[in-house]
Amino acid sequence: MNIMDFNMKKLAADAGTFLSRAVQFTEEKLGQAEKTELDAHLENLLSKAECTKQWTEKIMKQTEVLLQPNPNARIEEFFYEKLDRKAPSRMNNPELLGQYMIDAGNEFGPGTAYGNALIKCGETQKQIGTADRELIQTSAINFLTPLRNFIEGDYKTITKERKLLQNKRLDLDAAKTRLKKAKVAEARAASEQEVRITQSEFDRQAEITRLLLEGISSTHAHHLRCLNDFVEAQMTYYAQCYKYMLDLQKQLGSFPSTFLSNNNQSSSAPVQSVSTPSVLASASASLPSVSNSVVTSGISELKSSSGSRKARVLYDYDAANSSELSLLADEVITVYSIPGMDSDWLMGERGNQKGKVPITYLELLN
């Protein structure tokens, strides 16, 4: 029974406090009551925390969009995360494209120029897909998780303490209002005691809130380190992708634009060579780029002269008829041009064997 009486008294006291705060808040909004202002330093800290929260949320959400553009996939990952379960593993976009290219290449025939190139491109796309997964995983751990921890942890604590500070201020100002209205000496003495108590509680809560808010500077320093980790992860990812594409370009070789045209029709537009960014120089130092213009020039000179050149075979090639020469990848043969020959072919010699060979399967040597 005593416990029930205590609970009823506490409930009545809480209701009275809530009503007092509501009245004080309303009168402040109507300009009918004075309001205790926070000191300028605390106001600046509150503003800094709010600004940090807003921009952290925006950066976090946009980073998630960057790493996973598919909104349905993001929603699925969110639900699995809330259920504390691992999302099912699926191919990402580069891996899926790579698989399609490999399947198409095998369907068209690995021995054909197009089929072989599709397979090699598909393998590279799969490598890029793996690098993409590593970027997402590293970025999630080193960048997104710390940002999310701030939003869902530190800032929630700040919000809770800030709300408590607001309530303590309302209690203080309500007590000050009652003191002003007190006429009887006994009531005035009680109101003065209430003001002293609420002032002490307000000052204590203001100090707690201030200490929490001053931690925002440490949060910025921590997020700066996380940002550096994110930049490093991106740099590694783009360097890997560049290296993979440079490897692919080297495997495919750089040939006249007839290789890129349909129905073996010649095109006069030169293929642009890839320029190596200085930031990736270290990643690609061991992979020299083959200049398209040099190769094009070399073949043009060979066709216009009666001389011959050594050439490295890029892929296996099975001769379609007796006028062609079968080739093995990485072997070196002698090539030359004869009058009236199709622009996509050269004559090749290997010992006593000779026959037509497709330009797209060759890399001219100096």
Curated annotation (Swiss-Prot):
Q: Which residues form a coiled coil?
A: 34-54, 160-185
Q: What are the BAR domain coordinates in residue numbering?
A: 27-261
Question: Where is the protein found, in the record's own terms?
Answer: Cytoplasm; Golgi apparatus membrane; Mitochondrion outer membrane
Region listing for Membrane-binding amphipathic helix, in residue ranges: 1-30
Question: What InterPro entries does its record include?
Answer: AH/BAR_dom_sf (IPR027267), BAR_dom (IPR004148), Endophilin_SH3RF (IPR050384), SH3-like_dom_sf (IPR036028), SH3_domain (IPR001452), SH3GLB1_BAR (IPR035695), SH3GLB_SH3 (IPR028503)
What GO MF terms are annotated?
lipid binding
Q: Which UniProt keywords apply?
A: Apoptosis, Coiled coil, Cytoplasm, Golgi apparatus, Lipid-binding, Membrane, Mitochondrion, Mitochondrion outer membrane, SH3 domain
Region described as Required for membrane binding: 1-37
Classify the main location. Answer: cytoplasm
Example of a GO biological process term: apoptotic process
Topological relation to the membrane, as annotated = Peripheral membrane protein
**Subunit info?**
Homodimer, and heterodimer with SH3GLB2. Binds BAX. Binds DNM1, HTT, AMPH, BIN1 and ARFGAP1.
PANTHER family the UniProt entry points to = ENDOPHILIN-B1, SH3 DOMAIN-CONTAINING
In UniProt terms, what function does this protein have? May be required for normal outer mitochondrial membrane dynamics. Required for coatomer-mediated retrograde transport in certain cells. May recruit other proteins to membranes with high curvature. May promote membrane fusion.
Q: Family, per the entry?
A: Belongs to the endophilin family.
Cite the domain annotation text.
An N-terminal amphipathic helix, the BAR domain and a second amphipathic helix inserted into helix 1 of the BAR domain (N-BAR domain) induce membrane curvature and bind curved membranes.
Q: What is this protein called?
A: Endophilin-B1
